[in-house]
Amino acid sequence: VAWGHTLEELAAALETGDAERAQRALDAARGLDDNTRALDEALSLGCETARAAPLRWADRAALDRQEEIGRHLDFAVRDTRVLARDTVRYVRANGSPVPDVASAVAGLGRAVWALAAAFDDPQAREQPRQLALRAAGRASEAIARHADLALTEIAGQVRSTAADLMRAAQAGAPDEDAFAEAATDEMLADPPDTPAGGQPTTPPDSST
């Protein structure tokens, strides 16, 4: 999917300090909205059809799960766009390679690929959830390691995107899996301390 490739390109830009590559990834991130909008429309139509047609009621649970996934993906795509914007700003102003932050962003890409593979298979939800959790952990380590505010913001966006991906992976999970949602909320509510010279991350601007 284009989204996973965009995250891979952002990671490569952070790994190498390549400003042109970062800009291309930002341009690609800005184009992701069309894909998510088309997915939302298709899922909404499918759910409406299933609710109206008794012969398709058996499809409702799967469609409801996919519709819930779509809602979380919409937030994650917005976070990705802010992540790309912050990456461009950092690379243009500094340009120093940051392999640890790049690794966190690359981890998001792997989570996106795994979530795409699990879209039609609720039993496969654990792999994308674990990959997103791992990416968030790497971002948390980066926040503690770097004093650069721009890097702190990038790492914070990785954590926000990872949380949305985790929620998407858990969509339609039974009640006994509610602990996973609680863990996601706790991950966001308790960010690590920032180093001297850094500041806590700010929420993404939904207008970007």
Labelled PLM ranges:
Residues 65-198, 203-208:
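Soluble C-terminal extramembrane regulatory/interaction domains of multi-pass membrane proteins
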